[in-house]
């Protein structure tokens, strides 16, 4: 826990904190500008269930339609001594996001995990199929699920 505390203190000294980011997300949403949130999950720094609940609850308080991308960390530069993010941790963050009520939660920086698709929040139909580098198939029709007709939030659908 010492590393986590030191990292938080250093983050506070070297930045304005997270509040300007949170305020910007709220403002952009109020202005009707499409936004997506990405969290790079770094082992020992921001990989607790408490962190995931906090992020998911914040996003949910703004809009359940905001996609949350949960990305794996790989050791590099000044954090070479840390391990890569375990898949189980990423998957737990995804579960927390979905349990909180977010409609669109994705895993990033990992392959062959089966959690990159966009599914209809109402009926579960796969709407968009992806690979690591792009979209394979987009089944959304006029911003609606072709199966149940639910309106699907997004840009360029």
Describe the role of every protein-language-model region.
Residues 120-123, 145-148:
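Short cysteine-rich clusters marking metal-coordination/redox-active sites
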Residues 108-112, 155:
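Acidic carboxylate-rich catalytic motifs and surrounding loops in phosphoryl-/glycosyl-chemistry enzymes
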Residues 87-97:
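Short alpha-helix
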Residues 126, 151:
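Cys/His-rich metal-chelating microdomains
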Residues 129-130, 154-155:
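Short, non-ligating residues that shape and space the ligands of small metal-coordination modules
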Residues 1-85:
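Conserved AdoMet/S-adenosylmethionine-binding subsite of the radical SAM
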Residues 133-142:
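Short linker/helix segments within small regulatory modules
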């Amino acid at each position: 826990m010492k590393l986590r505390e030191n990292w938080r203190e250093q983050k506070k000294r070297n930045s304005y904190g997270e509040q300007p980011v949170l305020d910007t997300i709220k403002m952009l949403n109020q202005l009707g500008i499409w936004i997506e949130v990405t969290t790079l999950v770094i082992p020992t720094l921001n990989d607790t269930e408490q962190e995931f609940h906090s992020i998911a609850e914040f996003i949910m308080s703004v809009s359940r339609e905001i996609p949350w991308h949960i990305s794996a960390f790989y050791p590099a530069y000044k954090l070479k001594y840390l391990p890569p993010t375990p898949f189980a941790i990423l998957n737990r963050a995804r579960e927390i996001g979905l349990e909180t009520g977010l409609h669109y939660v994705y895993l990033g920086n990992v392959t062959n995990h089966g959690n990159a698709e966009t599914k209809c929040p109402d009926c579960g139909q796969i709407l968009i199929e992806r690979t690591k580098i792009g979209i394979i198939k987009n089944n959304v029709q006029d911003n609606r699920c072709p199966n149940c007709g639910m309106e699907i939030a997004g840009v360029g659908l």
